[in-house]
Structures are given as structure tokens and as C-alpha cells.
Amino acid sequence: MEEFQRYLELDRSQQHYFLYPLIFQEYIYXXAHDHGLNRNRSILLENAGYDNKFSLLIVKRLITRMYQYQQNHLILSTNDSNQNLFLRRNKNLYSQMISEGFAVIVEIPFSLQLISSLESKGIVKSHNLRSIHSIFPFLEDKISHFIYVLEILIPYPVHLEILVQTLRYWVKDASSLHLLRFFLHEYCNWNTPNKAGSSFSKRNQRLFFFLYNSHLCEYESIFIFLRNQSSHLRSTSSGTLLERIYFYGKIKYLVKVFVKAFQVNLLLLKDPFMHYVRYQGKSILASKGTPFLMKKWTYYFVNLWQCHFYLWSQPGRICINQLYNHSLDLLGYLSSARLNPSMVRGQMLENSFLIDNAINKFDTIVPIIPLIGSLAKAKFCNVLGHPISKAVWTDLSDSDIIDRFGRICRNLSHYHSGSSQKKSLYRIKYILRLSCARTLARKHKSTVRAFLKRLGSGLLEEFFTAEEQVLYLTLPRASSASQRLYRRRIWYLDIICINDLANHE
């Protein structure tokens, strides 16, 4: 218990971060603006006009009003709505600008902590580990040999004040936290968290993602403590992001509950063959243990949510499944581990015998129904998968239309290159090709057949993916061995964000 408390009571001398003055610096908004341009470039290219909302004049006007009203504390109080001109003029635009600037500022101490932690531990930064595809080789090597999998939908805080309380353990600048509460109170109605919170998160994505990730980090740090049965909560992969200041005081009740059960119950949770994976709000816990062990983990997760995060666990949040007859819906793939039987014939002197051997094989396929639903939502086809024309693109030139369709097709092919079965991917390519042809035919007021006959079938050569061209150079198609390599799954280490159409969650 003393070791546990010693870790939780971290050194406070390194936690003096005064971030509030940075909110008045122009370069902060310029950095947030550049980040927003890079992050909001969708493959559908339908978010033009983002740059028109931000200008140096608007930033200067915003900072002037913040200086003007900060002495009267009107930026932190909304009691007198008649005098608070800051809130009344350009309310949504100013809130979005300040929230994005605040998100850049509050990430500074975390970046400094992470860099210092990596330097002290001698860890070399590997950009390949940032790739989304890097998780699948791990699943193929580890989880395919396991028996049970625990699928967990991490509950989201009903009240956004829980997110502020979590951030309070990391940032000791009271003014910055008051500013954050001001935004959450003014632009999110506390009485209707679902509707207002959704609107707030869409307008202020970077700040919302930061708050949610800090919430997940708090949740996972306690889970690591239970997993390792130790007071040492630090993780090599997460670095100092798992360190907090006021952790012990907040979970005093939770500690009392767990300490009483450590000597008996946690012994039942000891399982060296256990792996944990998380993406977005879903986590997976795989084990070679028994169903009783998985039920014990379910019990501890429910108590963790209720005692520490004040969240009531809803039915169906945690599901226990056997891996060999269940598929994991993760990162736009349906992943499963199936037995691949093989027969080996052996001969010893005059006696021959057959050995039946079954090997677990990790299988990944593209879920065709959700992907068609995403295409239908983007107006490339109907709900049945029949291609339709993209009417909003008919004003573009022919080369721009082909370039946009080709870019979407290449991105999907690049992201789903790890699929074990290519039929679903070929169907998606067919839908996009025919949708492109229908769009061009609609623009020229012609039929698809007449349009392709007039211009030739080579018009849609843009749809040949870059991966195929690379494979032609690296894997010659002459030998049968190279053909087997060509059909294998390929995981790329340069994918740092999930494809717009592949994100069905």
C-alpha cells in the first residue's frame, strides 16, 4: 500500500505549467489553423472554405476583446448577458478559434513530458509504430493463439465535468481550467449532454479528442495497475502520459475496495498470456484463461467505471466471446482466428502414417455491407450497392472528376490491402468506377455506354492503384512463388489515420 501511495504522490516540482498567457499569442492560432487545414483534408474534398473563417484580422480582434474583458472577468462569467459583448458577437467562430488554440496550448506540457521521458529511457522514436496497420501484425502473432476475447465498449462520461476533473491532475493552471469550464458550460448545455455534446465535439474536434484521450489514459492507467499487480503504473509505450498528480486522493474509495481483494482476488487474475488492444472507444482483452477469469475481469471493469469515473455500466458493454467462432470488428476489418487443417504423411521403414495438424490462422476481411453503407451515405451508390452519379461534382472538369474518384479508390485499396479476400474490395472498385462513368455521362448529357464508346475504355485507367504498380516492380509475376507473395496480405506502415469511408463506427 505504501508503494502504491508513493507512486501516486508524484513530484509536484515539475508540474508548474502556466498556460493561460499563451491564449493571447497570435502564433498559437496560426499553429492551430495550420493543423486544422492538414487534419480536415478529407478524401472527399468537400470541406472547402475552412480557410475563409480564419484571418489575422479576426485573431487580432479576438485577442483585443479578450484583453478588454479579462479584467472584469466577463470571459469567465456569463451572469450579465447584456454587457458581455464578447459572447454576443461571432459567438460560434470565436469559440471555435479559442478552443482550437486552447487545444494546442494544453498539449504543450504533455509533449514536453513525453520527450523527456523518451530521452531518459533511451527510447528511439519509431514513426512506423504510429501506423494503424502496425496493430495487425501484432494481432496475427499474438491473439490468434488465444482462446477467449473480451470486447469492451468504454463508456463515455455523461457529464463533461468528469473530463475537466481528469485534466486537473495534469495541468495545475487554474485559469486555463476555468477557461475550459467556460466553454463547456457556454457551448454545451449541461442538461442535454447527448445532443449538445455531439454538436460541441463536431465544432471543436481537436479539443474534444484531447479531453477524451486524457479520459482514456486515466482509465487505462488503472487497468495496467490491475494487470501487473504492482504499484508501478508506468508503461513503456505511453511514457509519462500515465503519470498523474492527484490520483491517490481521487480513487481513495476504489483503492480501499481493491486493497481488500488484492491478496485473494487478484491472484485469480494473474495471467501472463494476456494482451490488450484499444482503438477509439473500443478495447479488446485476449487471454488463454478460463471463462471464470474473464468474468472476474468484467467484474473489475464494472467496479472501476462506477467507483472512479461515476459511470453506470450498461448491459452489453462487455462481451465475452471465443475467438475461434467470433469476428472482431476493428479498424474497418473483420478479424478472426480460424483453424487451418493440414495433413502430413510420414513414413518409417515399411510403415506409413498420417498426422492431422491444425494451425490457427489469422484472417482479415473487408466488411462489404458497412462499406457500401458508407458509399451510399457519400452518394456514390444506393443502399443496395447500385452505382449512381455524384451530382455535386458535375460542375468540375473531367480531369478533376476522374482524379477525385481515382484518389478515393486508391486510398481504399491502400487501406484495405491487408484483406485476406479481395472480392469485397473489387466490388467497391467496381462501384466507384461505374459511379465515375455515370457522373461524367451526366455532365455531358449522355449515356454511360455511349460516353465510354466515344472516349474509350482507357479513360478510367486512374483507378489502377499505386500498390499494384509497386508490386509489379518488386514482385515479378513470372514465377509461382511470386504469385503467392502477391496474393498475401500487405500491411503499410505509413497510414496514420483511418480512411473516411472505412470508418463505420
Curated annotation (Swiss-Prot):
One of its GO terms (biological process) is RNA splicing. Keywords: Chloroplast, mRNA processing, Plastid, RNA-binding, tRNA processing. Transmembrane segments: none annotated. Its main location: plastid. The keyword Cell division does not apply. GO terms for molecular function: RNA binding. GO terms for cellular component: chloroplast. The keyword Plastid applies. It is found in: Plastid, Chloroplast. InterPro entries: Domain_X, Maturase_MatK, Maturase_MatK_N. Usually encoded in the trnK tRNA gene intron. Probably assists in splicing its own and other chloroplast group II introns. Belongs to the intron maturase 2 family. MatK subfamily. This is Maturase K. It comes from Hedera helix.
